[in-house]
Amino acid sequence: MLAQVPNILSRRTILLGGGYFCLAGNAFAAPAGDLEDFGKLARVFDGDSFVLGSGLKVRLANIFAPEKGQDYHRAAASALAALIEGRKIGLSYTGPKRDRYDRALAQVYTLKPDGTPDQWVQSEMVRLGYGRVRSYVDTAWKIKTLLDEETVARDAGRGLWQSPDFSVRPPDPNPLAQFVDSFQIVEGLIISAAQVRGMTFLNFGSDYKTDFTVSIARRDRRKFEKAGINLEDMEGRRVRVRGWVELYNGPVIWLDHPEAIEFPGGDFS
């Protein structure tokens, strides 16, 4: 069932940590191209999806808000509603226009009275701590901006970052095994890097059969090379990776694009 739009917060402020957090001063990113769809909010599903009055269902590209049953699900939905309620909304597309559920997969903007963009909603949600950044190979526009804002929100303990449900995980295989089939952020030191039959394996322990591993397919190596990341020279590097945790000789995250890996100590060199 669709959640009714909350009325308890104004669209210009979000209740956060017992006080009000002003929305001014965000890192605004102008649309990559023309705004293509417009409308006003009808109802909110959760912190990363809603439906317009026209009936068009919208999924905010590049962020992952708490799901139903998780901590901060209702708070994230309220935050999204507060940002866009009563505002004219414009959608810009930076990758596929529809997801597998036929929702518009869009960068979402609130608009000024003259129709020009006012706020980039993804940026606001991440900055307030109500969305984790999630990039895909075909939707990685302005990811660095969002990742920087996520780091600030996480360090400040805003929103969902107060909950252990969304902690950055260490690469300990036993606890990570509890999060199989879920989106996680993992940070740790790469112990070794190896190529086997064209696959690249970044190992976070001494036993590849049980330890956490990041895997990159042969067909995706070129993307990392073009981004200046030498996968063969990763031993001893501290990295932060994000993606879906699976089991394959221990917990594994498969990466198919370089935007899903960060270097907390600085850019790769």
Describe these PLM feature segments.
Residues 2-9, 14-269:
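Small beta-barrel nucleic-acid-binding modules, primarily SNase/OB-fold domains
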